[in-house]
Amino acid sequence: MRILVLHGPNLNLLGKREPEIYGTLSLDDINGALEALGAEFESDLGFFQSNSEGALVDAIQQAPENYDGILINPAAYTHTSVALRDALAAIGLPFVEVHLSNIHRREEFRHHSYLAPLALGQICGFGLDSYLLGLRALFNHIKN
């Protein structure tokens, strides 16, 4: 089983950016924890981070060639990107949307997700555990 992990804009700044909201773990720390969990499931993970909406759309469109599912933190594009939503709808791979912070406890504009209606589920507010829970759920869905 192969899973693509997509990280949206500004997540390359994790560990430095607003640690009171996003915590102190770096993106490498998160990827390392996901890699360890992937090994438990005998799964290969691919990782991609971009601040560019188009690059993320390209990665989504190419995913069916090599991956069985997607774990995505679309970050700010959660609330704005019809392009990401349409790309995910077009390819038909199962995906889980994750967020480090609870987007529903934050500013009003962060409460809406264009992706959530298409996702297997959305997990938010648990920091690193949002990613780990999302990956476990995706593994279980694909296996069953």
Curated annotation (Swiss-Prot):
GO molecular function: 3-dehydroquinate dehydratase activity
Keywords from the named record: Amino-acid biosynthesis, Aromatic amino acid biosynthesis, Lyase
Biochemical pathway: Metabolic intermediate biosynthesis; chorismate biosynthesis; chorismate from D-erythrose 4-phosphate and phosphoenolpyruvate: step 3/7
Gene3D superfamilies: Dehydroquinase, class II
Matching PROSITE patterns: DEHYDROQUINASE_II (PS01029)
Protein's gene: aroQ
Assembly and oligomerization: Homododecamer.
Function in brief: Catalyzes a trans-dehydration via an enolate intermediate.
Catalysed transformations (reactions): 3-dehydroquinate = 3-dehydroshikimate + H2O
Protein name in the entry: 3-dehydroquinate dehydratase
NCBIfam families, per the entry: aroQ, PRK05395.1-1, PRK05395.1-2, PRK05395.1-3, PRK05395.1-4
Site description Transition state stabilizer, residues in chain: R17
Example of a GO biological process term: chorismate biosynthetic process
Record: residues binding substrate: N73, H79, D86, L100, S101, R110
Assigned EC number: 4.2.1.10
